[in-house]
Amino acid sequence: MPKLKTKSSAKKRFKISATGKVMMAQAGKRHGMIKRTNSQIRKLRGTTAMSKQDGKIVKSYMPYSLRG
Protein backbone atom coordinates (compact mmCIF):
# COMPACT_ATOMS: atom_id res chain seq x y z
CA MET A 1 0.00 0.00 0.00
CA PRO A 2 1.46 3.42 -0.91
CA LYS A 3 2.22 6.07 1.65
CA LEU A 4 -0.47 8.66 2.33
CA LYS A 5 0.36 12.29 1.70
CA THR A 6 -0.09 14.98 4.33
CA LYS A 7 -1.83 18.12 3.07
CA SER A 8 0.81 20.86 3.03
CA SER A 9 -1.71 23.55 3.92
CA ALA A 10 -2.73 21.65 7.07
CA LYS A 11 0.80 21.06 8.35
CA LYS A 12 1.55 24.78 7.98
CA ARG A 13 -1.60 25.97 9.77
CA PHE A 14 -2.28 23.45 12.55
CA LYS A 15 -0.44 21.67 15.35
CA ILE A 16 -1.62 18.69 17.39
CA SER A 17 -1.34 19.19 21.17
CA ALA A 18 -0.10 16.54 23.59
CA THR A 19 -3.70 15.66 24.47
CA GLY A 20 -4.68 15.32 20.80
CA LYS A 21 -6.45 18.65 20.32
CA VAL A 22 -5.91 20.56 17.10
CA MET A 23 -4.41 23.98 17.84
CA MET A 24 -4.85 26.89 15.46
CA ALA A 25 -4.09 30.60 15.31
CA GLN A 26 -6.84 32.96 16.41
CA ALA A 27 -8.97 34.31 13.57
CA GLY A 28 -9.71 37.99 13.02
CA LYS A 29 -6.30 39.67 13.19
CA ARG A 30 -5.37 40.15 9.54
CA HIS A 31 -6.71 43.65 9.01
CA GLY A 32 -9.12 46.22 10.45
CA MET A 33 -7.44 46.56 13.84
CA ILE A 34 -8.43 50.25 14.05
CA LYS A 35 -12.09 49.43 14.62
CA ARG A 36 -11.39 46.78 17.28
CA THR A 37 -10.90 47.60 20.94
CA ASN A 38 -7.55 46.98 22.61
CA SER A 39 -9.08 44.22 24.72
CA GLN A 40 -10.37 42.46 21.58
CA ILE A 41 -6.93 42.60 19.99
CA ARG A 42 -5.32 41.33 23.19
CA LYS A 43 -7.70 38.37 23.43
CA LEU A 44 -6.86 37.32 19.87
CA ARG A 45 -3.19 36.65 20.68
CA GLY A 46 -1.74 33.17 20.61
CA THR A 47 -3.48 29.95 19.65
CA THR A 48 -6.78 28.32 20.44
CA ALA A 49 -8.12 24.78 20.34
CA MET A 50 -10.30 23.87 17.40
CA SER A 51 -13.74 22.35 17.94
CA LYS A 52 -13.80 18.57 18.15
CA GLN A 53 -15.84 18.18 14.95
CA ASP A 54 -13.55 20.38 12.86
CA GLY A 55 -10.47 18.85 14.48
CA LYS A 56 -11.49 15.42 13.24
CA ILE A 57 -11.51 16.72 9.66
CA VAL A 58 -8.09 18.36 10.05
CA LYS A 59 -6.62 15.18 11.55
CA SER A 60 -7.71 13.28 8.46
CA TYR A 61 -5.48 15.63 6.43
CA MET A 62 -2.46 14.63 8.56
CA PRO A 63 -2.39 10.82 8.59
CA TYR A 64 1.02 10.57 10.28
CA SER A 65 0.50 13.07 13.09
CA LEU A 66 1.66 11.28 16.23
CA ARG A 67 -1.48 11.94 18.24
CA GLY A 68 -3.97 11.68 15.38
UniProtKB/Swiss-Prot annotation:
GO MF entries: structural constituent of ribosome
Keyword list, A-Z: Ribonucleoprotein, Ribosomal protein
Signal peptide: none
Pfam families: Ribosomal_L35p
InterPro entries with a match to the protein in the record: Ribosomal_bL35, Ribosomal_bL35-like, Ribosomal_bL35_CS, Ribosomal_bL35_sf
A Gene Ontology term for the protein's cellular component: cytosolic large ribosomal subunit
One of the protein's GO biological processes: translation
Similarity annotation: Belongs to the bacterial ribosomal protein bL35 family.
Protein name: Large ribosomal subunit protein bL35
Lineage of the organism: Bacteria, Pseudomonadati, Pseudomonadota, Alphaproteobacteria, Candidatus Pelagibacterales
Gene name, Swiss-Prot/TrEMBL: rpmI
